[in-house]
Amino acid sequence: MKQRQQLSRRSVLRGAGFGALGLAGAALVGCGSGGNAPEDTRVAAKDAGTNIASTLGVTAPVVAGTPRKGGSYTTAMIAKLTHDPANGVNSGAWPMLSELLLEGDPLTSKLAPNIASSWEVADPLTLIFKIKPGLKISNKAPWNGRAFDAEDVAWNFERHAGLYADRLKLPKAYFQRGSLIANFMKAEAVDKNTVKVTLTKPNSAFFSSLSNNRMMTMPKEMDDIGFKDPMKFAGIGPWEIAEYQNDIRVKYTRNKDFMLRPNQPWFDEVVWEGIADPNAAVAAFASKQIDAIDITANPDAFPLLQKTRPDANVYSWPTGTYKNLRPQVRYAPFRDFRVRQALHLAIDYADIATSTWKEDWVYLLATIPAFDEAWSPVKVKSLPGYNPDTKAQDRQESARLLAAAGFPLGKGLSWEIITEGTSAANVANLTRFQGQMKTVYPEMDIRIRPLSDKAALDAVWTKGEFQMQMGGISVPPDAIVDVIQNYHTQGSRNYGGFSEPALDALLDKAIAEFNRDARKELFNEFQTKFQNEWRPDYLLHLPRVKTLVTPTIGGYDKVSGTFGTGVNVGAARVYYVNK
């Protein structure tokens, strides 16, 4: 990150004009003096989310009434917080304290200005961001209300990319969001309100990736402040931390200097109560101790809450987090594609999903069907391994593959699966999987080891210290970026250690492709080989979110969707209503 003289700019595309597209939705132009790119080189804006939303539907009731300023909003904090956005299973307090450079629509992922007022393509390897002036960091030492400017933004880019790994004495793999901004070389503050990003190669998903909720910005001094004491944190977001008791209670109060969205935040304060037990959280909502609850991972609670809180509004949509079962390919048996494919053919995906989610789920192959490039749930259901009607035939092929790999009827196959023990859905899904394999292959030995919480799981799976792992993967707002993160040799979420040169080459080509049809064709090739030749992962199903909210709170219809904010971090956008 360097301060530079005023940039001499060439012909550019302004983000305010085509921001809905991200780089995935516009050709890189500006190399010559002409204005727009030819029509056939552009990627049209895709209505990400429409495909799956039409399959499952979106329920988002509008609460009538006038928004009222003030009041307190309380929700349950079930997961342990991890506070460095570059690493960990969540971004901790930062979605409350700070903001994203660009925002994506909750359903469509269409981009809109946020910290950046415009985003431009100067040439295939040069991106220009204009930062809104007047943004202030909270009035807390050492910042004391100083301006948040281009130098902070440039620092965030370089830190997310892992450029400071050596200086911080951290492994490059620590910076898990690096593949979100693949091909990043450097960021420079041209002036107080202009950032120039240089890429090593074109990246067709760079802009859309910046709307991922793990890409929260921070003041450039945060590495010096450290991430151990959240009471020292500050940002430009709608909230300030007023109280922090680890795993017990976090209280936020309104940041009076917040300026990005008029009137926000509406509430005076937000409280996250630490309730580790999902059933205790259900009881808290039933007794009106908390104002909203996400019961996606605890679907059996819905009938109870329908009785105890019949007044609550129900919001539901296709989640952006799929359930997966990932083999560690460094474990010898899983290096063999035949073993990995045999397990796929033996799994009864519908049995696992319906036992937990009833009918509130869909099939998926390599990423969520919200993406235009992804195969539809109907197509996936028709494929070997997924199709319930051909399960007996598929299991015969499974046995043949295992025998050819040296494990006749599963004999000699033994492994442990780790998961988050506090997730009832994960444990139930694994128990179902274990039972299926025991029925099909009685001599196969599968053990389940639930870990205490997400933080404990994160400490193990990010190092690849497992034989198989079950969890949930929250996708970024771009299909190519999602699969690069998870399956490219250099992918920052490639916890299973999968490495296939042909896959790497295909995805490297796809990320640099800006023609919509060509991009989709490349992704189609990827999905075909994922199904027939690679099988690095088992995406079990995609559940449907179910959130209940106190009826006097409005605004949730604006944050509901596959790429929405959720009951906790969306607090600045919701409000009490005067009816």
Residue ranges and their predicted role:
Residues 1-11, 16-27:
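N-terminal secretory signal peptides
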Residues 71-123, 158, 165, 232-235:
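N-terminal lobe/hinge region of extracytoplasmic solute-binding protein
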Residues 117-167, 196, 284, 333-335:
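Aromatic- and charge-enriched surface segment that lines or borders ligand/interaction sites
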Residues 120, 130, 152, 166-220, ...:
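Surface-exposed binding/hinge segments that line
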Residues 138, 198-216, 230-280, 301-322:
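Aromatic-rich, solvent-exposed beta-strand/loop patch
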Residues 356, 389-392, 443-462, 481-551, ...:
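Extracytoplasmic/peripheral linker and loop segments enriched in polar/acidic and small residues
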Residues 361-404, 422-428:
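Structural transition elements
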Residues 547-579:
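Long beta-strand-rich cores associated with HINT superfamily self-processing modules
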